[in-house]
Amino acid sequence: MTSSHPPSPPIEPMLAKIADILPDEPGFQFEPKWDGFRALVFRHDTSLLLQSRDLKPLNRYFPELDRALLEQLPPGCIVDGEIVIATPRGLDFDALQQRLHPAESRVRRLSTQTPASFVAFDLLAADGESTMALPQAERRVFLEALLRDATPPLHLTPVTFDRAEASRWLKEFEGAGLDGVVAKLESALYEPGRRAMLKIKHARSADCVVAGLRWYKDLTDAVGSLLLGLYDDAGTLRHVGVTSSFTMAMRRDLARELAPLREQALEAHPWRATIDADTQAGPGSQSRWSRGKDLSWVPLRPERVCEVRYDHLQGSRFRHATTFLRWRSDKPPRDCRYDQLEVTTPYELARVFGA
């Protein structure tokens, strides 16, 4: 253990950069990538702070964790991990987002109906001393000792040093709602705010209908993102997400290229009903976690198809923004259906911790 005193909050969590494949060099350890809210837990003498990735307190949104972690974690420790909500269908990120609500009564009700868990994967301090200058391998040993008697909702993330097993995790654990695999150098120190780890996520492609756009910032001659749709079994075009990975030159080219599709686009647009009804189903609808963001959009006649790269679905939509790959002028929009997407085999979440 190091002799320096533990740092005070806030602390930026160490981050990960995307890698295409699992590293095959020696000296890496692999962990599941949890799909939740990143959080640091600061256990003081008689209190506890749950700090978000953007350095804000989360205690009021997760009162059940505030109590449980205060009981189970010893004073003087700082633990890095992920807040998740587990359901019979796997991890539920939407349920997490519903916690970010100003009404305390609603938060407390949800804390009973859909209780959260905390999955620990790193240790920044123990026994009142910093561990950030220790190698990852040593921090893991101390973390395992700290959580030897942990009980739900506190969990220790699994770890493997076998690349083949990590590859199996990458494939199988998605069925429980996990987001990929994280690779950490065993010799690495904890570096707040630095992308010192690797994250390997699922990579797939899909052909989608382009049915709208959003402008780039306050410009009306540059596209910020394209709104994507897929047809369901009933023949209804559903909004599934956005793609926004464009250079500035591409943004201006797209504005010119798509201008003809803006003409008379709203008259028979498949998403017009959601606009008129002001429901939460339309691509411009507000949610409690997007208040203040400009979600206005410009409808396009749904006549163009593009291929995008995505990682996985959350419900009926892409979990993250997709990456634009190319136009598919050879494909009719009506052929862009949900049934083209890869179906993930369900995987019991409890088996992840038994891995």
Task: Say what each PLM segment does.
Residues M1-A355:
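Catalytic cores of nucleic-acid ligases and guanylyltransferases
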